[in-house]
Amino acid sequence: MSRQSTLYSFFPKSPALGDTKKAAAEASRQGAAASGASASRGGDAAWSEAEPGSRSAAVSASSPEAKDLNGGLRRASSSAQAVPPSSCDFSPGDLVWAKMEGYPWWPCLVYNHPFDGTFIRKKGKSVRVHVQFFDDSPTRGWVSKRMLKPYTGSKSKEAQKGGHFYSSKSEILRAMQRADEALSKDTAERLQLAVCDEPSEPEEEEETEVHEAYLSDKSEEDNYNESEEEAQPSVQGPRRSSRQVKKRRVISDSESDIGGSDVEFKPDTKQEGSSDDASSGVGDSDSEDLGTFGKGAPKRKRAMVAQGGLRRKSLKKETGSAKRATPILSETKSTLSAFSAPQNSESQTHVSGGGNDSSGPTVWYHETLEWLKPEKRRDEHRRRPDHPEFNPTTLYVPEEFLNSCTPGMRKWWQLKSQNFDLVIFYKVGKFYELYHMDAVIGVSELGLIFMKGNWAHSGFPEIAFGRFSDSLVQKGYKVARVEQTETPEMMEARCRKMAHVSKFDRVVRREICRIITKGTQTYSVLDGDPSENYSRYLLSLKEKEEETSGHTRVYGVCFVDTSLGKFFIGQFSDDRHCSRFRTLVAHYPPVQILFEKGNLSTETKTVLKGSLSSCLQEGLIPGSQFWDATKTLRTLLEGGYFTGNGDSSTVLPLVLKGMTSESDSVGLTPGEESELALSALGGIVFYLKKCLIDQELLSMANFEEYFPLDSDTVSTVKPGAVFTKASQRMVLDAVTLNNLEIFLNGTNGSTEGTLLERLDTCHTPFGKRLLKQWLCAPLCSPSAISDRLDAVEDLMAVPDKVTEVADLLKKLPDLERLLSKIHNVGSPLKSQNHPDSRAIMYEETTYSKKKIIDFLSALEGFKVMCKVSGLLEEVAGGFTSKTLKQVVTLQSKSPKGRFPDLTAELQRWDTAFDHEKARKTGLITPKAGFDSDYDQALADIRENEQSLLEYLDKQRSRLGCKSIVYWGIGRNRYQLEIPENFATRNLPEEYELKSTKKGCKRYWTKTIEKKLANLINAEERRDTSLKDCMRRLFCNFDKNHKDWQSAVECIAVLDVLLCLANYSQGGDGPMCRPEIVLPGEDTHPFLEFKGSRHPCITKTFFGDDFIPNDILIGCEEEAEEHGKAYCVLVTGPNMGGKSTLIRQAGLLAVMAQLGCYVPAEKCRLTPVDRVFTRLGASDRIMSGESTFFVELSETASILRHATAHSLVLVDELGRGTATFDGTAIANAVVKELAETIKCRTLFSTHYHSLVEDYSKSVCVRLGHMACMVENECEDPSQETITFLYKFIKGACPKSYGFNAARLANLPEEVIQKGHRKAREFERMNQSLQLFREVCLATEKPTINGEAIHRLLALINGL
């Protein structure tokens, strides 16, 4: 039986003493329950789950918990003034429709307040009327005059379907019956129905003022100065400082919900005026972003909680009189101070709102829990952090503590104990709440606002989830979205089926519906749009050291871009420096890494700690979390991930099937060379399963095997044979990508000044992603490179078409990601058992509209693609490039065409449903012929309706009465309404009387019952089809995924080719087509760039300052003078351009093999299989590697992996150690590169002794960056150095380091002292050299007398 309550039950706690206007502002987002819940039930629901049957929701004025509040709140409410009845259109005894914020219109009775003796109050310009709500347990309250309408009966037009007051809710229908009964009575009799005459709760009066203030603030006619809502200076002590800035405090909840009131919100999409203006805990700066939040937002109901307590107390005492409620003023101040907002976020973080009046900072409640303190914390198995198997993602919560919690809070702690590493967004009604330590994160990272109370608590509305969750995820947090997965009605039904129901059962179910991390973002309609176009990978890694040697290892890897649903899986051996693994993470940069605990070697840990320190890294427990290969295969087969394509059997994708043992036809035995790869996949599958996105991603069956780029690079193969393979790619490792600044610059880590920025003019996101992959792995096959260059020239030859195509491509959305989204929405697996399918979403209509908008955007995008294909197909006959012809030619018109013919399919979708109606309503109603289930249901409905009409005609003829008609609604339809004069005659025995009215009787027959049952069944099937219509339509669209994906791939290739063509014809200065020569027996590796320029500097620095240079290595014309020298020693003055020249050579080689024109007058080269770089000087602090160690590590990689076809770029090797050590190492490296490996090398150095050593070598050629020296003398301050930036033959005599010192503004005396010291070193070096020559000369038959004289002269000069 419903218990009696007051309107106070609907609203949260009241404001501080003397601050009623601030209360009006703060209450704007407080409390509402489900639309359509009755007024009394709305108040009771706040406590029903926590303590069923208790009356603790309405805190009695005599209880200790309420005693401190009553007096203060009565004083606050005294500001409301009684006004003459003439100011109101209603009088006591009138029946009205009344609407309170967040509730539907409700039948009410106007009557005088039981103690004030008036039914009207005025606050500012607003007028309120006292009413009693008709309900099982009548309740009363003050309602705005503007929210009252005359009640004219349940049969009135406005109360019927389509009317303003119509409702199908049973509570309202019962209230209307009571109001109809009252309508037939006179005023005196009606007033006797006013039975709710208990002493008024003080909070009721104050909270009604809050409600009215909110409404009046929204009204133009009742608008008053906003400054009245500003928080006023406090008179209660230092804790209550005034707020200086005018702002509305937007609050979502009070500690009552934290305490587990567990108020549930049941969305009602039919409710008018519901929106999201109330933003829980969201700062004012965010309020404009929540643009869809308008006035009339349903407010969440709040119940009062005992101050500072964890559990509600059941309060039995009733208030005897208003006098008994008078409190002690000091106690009131102390209690009400709990409701004041701290002045700044810093104080919010430390000062509790528990009513403590002390001036010093206190701590949040969760910080006082002993078992939660770091020194006492344990995991779920009670293991301490120093235990080797400690699990930091779980938390031990004592059972006695859980038992002391209210049901809502108990559920939160249970979820938190299993997911301690997550920030939990806990759904309460239409808001996501953050509690305890999560709330502290929300305030510090998101700018939310703490709620009042000694429990840390903040929140925000549902519609803002995407923005706030993404903000936390980008900062490295992991977010769990917890949704309500049953309504209160469903909970009640569940409890009725249980034999024994505890208070913990009487709480609606909540489940984790999604865990979001950096590596698992899918950008669903809740998550929002991606912030960048490039892929972000989740990488799983398993390692095994080779038994034969401790210096090599084998990696199993699996990585996935969750926004696309594309998996890469592979297994490869690697060296002790993890070279291949470093290259992988450079080409596919992960944002999150999974690995098996205890599995990684020291070298791999060094890579993770150094190069990948910014990634989230998570160790998984072997076996239970990081699965072995066998468990992975079994899970994939038993999970049914790869069914749904018309075949009920589960078949592994070809890539995975190829990794199983050939002897096992079932596919449960891993292949010998794939165990680690499949185990790495197991780690990924486990994590995706944990994040609840395994079904939507794996069901796409989009797998690709990963092979290291240098797999085919073997130095022993026949010269040039490897380059005939179209699959062969140039290897650019992580060091090279960084040193050449291909993707990110070394200054601030952005793309400014990089090759990617220079080239990237792609119009589509998927084109940008493809360009990046092409840059990671340029081609090596001369024929493939030439075909791309042909495509560039073909496009340059049709500028008009290119302009039209470019304009069309700009209109395309990210179709690659949209296809993944559509697949996820249409997934039948997800719709069957995923928690999201049970979630109660307040903004469901908004999300449906977003899904439809995405879908229609995809359809429009594919139409644009067809136009693009058609435009270029007109001129495709003149194209020489095979690739370009393939991507623009329809498969239906040419066997070599790759672009699918989408015309028929797109026309089918144009007629599938009303696009504009679906866009506006968020609902899809399929047209005839598109959805067989829906069509069959409609056909059955028409058939049964026609059958019933025919039966009516038969009964009319049978009884000889043409006035017989059908009557009834719902399941009581199709009653034969027969005039009474006919009904009195002998009727057939099968006629069963159902109802009567004056003048006629109504009958059913067995035939009607049977036909109606068939009709109802057909209608239910229709409704079920409509409910699941969007998913099934998306699933239908996804059946042609291969065609859609092929179209995207073709347009992506076209977009990148257009990008290359755009650069090729728009470069600053001369541009040339590279000539790639296949090496053979008579053609040795060479590189010839004439008049070449740096591709990026011309964009960064405009003008004619950049000097073009010739770079020749191994060319015939050079061989005539100096022999075939593959190594060029580059010298020159500091800041003379040596490093720029070296980077320029590497970038031009990359661009040439990418298939792009290069900024040069001439470009010829044999394919480069790999570019190595040793540039710059920096240490790796995180890896514990010094500057010199980094130099030697990079050099070791060069010597270990370089082949005769490689391009090696070394800049000042040896500078990180002692001069003689550095010189010796540099000398040895040059010798190895020039004489043993014989690869194309540019080696810059300031070691002039190195130049002298190789000045006569036929394997090494000398070159330097020219400069002009004026006033060269002993005094460096008198010299003037002019850099010519021209690369010419020969060696530079000096490095002119003191010129660089002067340009850097070193003190002159320091430069002079340094110069004198340098002269001393030079003389000593010359002396030692001459002495060595003398000593060598003594071994010869004749003595070099000239050398002796020079030595003596030098010694005398010292």
UniProtKB/Swiss-Prot annotation:
Domain PWWP spans what residues? 92-154
Sites bearing N6-acetyllysine, chain numbering: K67, K503
Q: Where is the composition biased (Basic and acidic residues)?
A: 263-273
Q: Give the Low complexity compositional bias ranges.
A: 25-46, 76-87
Where composition is biased (Basic residues), the residues are 240-249
Q: Where is the composition biased (Polar residues)?
A: 329-351
Question: Does Coiled coil show up as a keyword for this record?
Answer: no
Q: Looking at the record, which segments are called Disordered?
A: 1-87, 197-360
Where is this chain primarily localised? Answer: nucleus
Q: Which GO biological process categories is it annotated with? A: determination of adult lifespan; intrinsic apoptotic signaling pathway; intrinsic apoptotic signaling pathway in response to DNA damage; isotype switching; mismatch repair; negative regulation of DNA recombination; response to UV; somatic hypermutation of immunoglobulin genes
* Bias kind Acidic residues: ranges: 198-209, 219-231
Q: Which GO terms describe its molecular function?
A: ADP binding; ATP binding; ATP-dependent DNA damage sensor activity; chromatin binding; damaged DNA binding; DNA binding; enzyme binding; four-way junction DNA binding
Residues that, per the record, bind ATP: G1132, P1133, N1134, M1135, G1136, G1137, K1138, S1139
Residues the record lists as Phosphothreonine modifications: T269, T487, T1007
- Protein's cellular compartments: Nucleus; Chromosome
Free-text domain note: The PWWP domain specifically recognizes and binds trimethylated 'Lys-36' of histone H3 (H3K36me3).
Q: What family classification does the UniProt entry report for this protein?
A: Belongs to the DNA mismatch repair MutS family.
Function as written in the Swiss-Prot or TrEMBL entry: Component of the post-replicative DNA mismatch repair system (MMR). Heterodimerizes with MSH2 to form MutS alpha, which binds to DNA mismatches thereby initiating DNA repair. When bound, MutS alpha bends the DNA helix and shields approximately 20 base pairs, and recognizes single base mismatches and dinucleotide insertion-deletion loops (IDL) in the DNA. After mismatch binding, forms a ternary complex with the MutL alpha heterodimer, which is thought to be responsible for directing the downstream MMR events, including strand discrimination, excision, and resynthesis.
Q: How does it assemble?
A: Component of the DNA mismatch repair (MMR) complex composed at least of MSH2, MSH3, MSH6, PMS1 and MLH1. Heterodimer consisting of MSH2-MSH6 (MutS alpha). Forms a ternary complex with MutL alpha (MLH1-PMS1). Interacts with MCM9. Part of the BRCA1-associated genome surveillance complex (BASC), which contains BRCA1, MSH2, MSH6, MLH1, ATM, BLM, PMS2 and the RAD50-MRE11-NBS1 protein complex. This association could be a dynamic process changing throughout the cell cycle and within subnuclear domains.
Protein name from the UniProt record: DNA mismatch repair protein Msh6
Species per Swiss-Prot/TrEMBL record: Mus musculus
